């Protein structure tokens, strides 16, 4: 949509105290600018797809995000805990080392959410292989599947997944992140 004024006014006039925005960056920009223009000051919850400090920082610059109109992005990773930060540091260190060894900057992939997802998938796979080894059984499809069904796997940087007892529990807890309203000492929003 290119115009959210009617929808925003309906929400504002109904007294809604939070907006859940199921959209990507471009429609979110339109929504946030419309909320700014009609002085609708409630918090917005959206998907991790919008969790870019660059994107959200631009909203701060235009006054679309303010202390009275924050945007909270869901995140299935949480680096605010001691364990989450330790896991992120391990990921960042591994990615930076790989990049530097391959002529890259050392921070390109270490800050990339797709690289994080791949790292986590690989980590879960390695945890499963280690669980097969610990069980002392031959590595084959049947034993791998059996171990996957019996083991709770820790997700680096947050939560766990379990396939035990027929469950298909992926991430069962989410974090909410928001952008700071001021640039840091490097001149960027975080």
Language-model segments: which ranges?
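Extracellular/periplasmic Venus flytrap/periplasmic-binding protein
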Residues: 1-38
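Glycine-rich, aromatic-lined ligand/substrate-binding cores of catalytic
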Residues: 23, 42, 150
């Amino acid at each position: 949509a290119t115009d959210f004024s009617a929808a925003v006014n309906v929400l504002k006039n109904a007294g809604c105290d939070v907006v859940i925005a199921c959209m990507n960056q471009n429609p979110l920009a339109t929504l946030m600018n419309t909320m700014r223009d009609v002085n609708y000051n409630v918090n917005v919850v959206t998907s991790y797809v919008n969790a870019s400090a660059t994107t959200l920082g631009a909203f701060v610059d235009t006054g679309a995000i303010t202390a009275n109109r924050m945007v909270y992005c869901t995140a299935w990773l949480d680096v605010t805990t001691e364990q989450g930060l330790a896991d992120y540091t391990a990921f960042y260190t591994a990615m930076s080392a790989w990049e530097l060894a391959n002529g890259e900057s050392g921070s390109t992939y270490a800050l990339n959410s797709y690289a994080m997802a791949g790292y986590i998938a690989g980590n879960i796979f390695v945890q499963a292989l280690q669980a097969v080894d610990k069980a002392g059984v031959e590595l084959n499809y049947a034993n791998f599947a059996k171990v996957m069904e019996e083991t709770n796997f820790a997700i680096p940087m947050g939560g766990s997944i379990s396939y035990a007892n027929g469950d298909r529990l992926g991430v069962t807890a989410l974090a909410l992140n928001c952008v700071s309203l001021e640039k840091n000492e490097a001149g960027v929003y975080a």
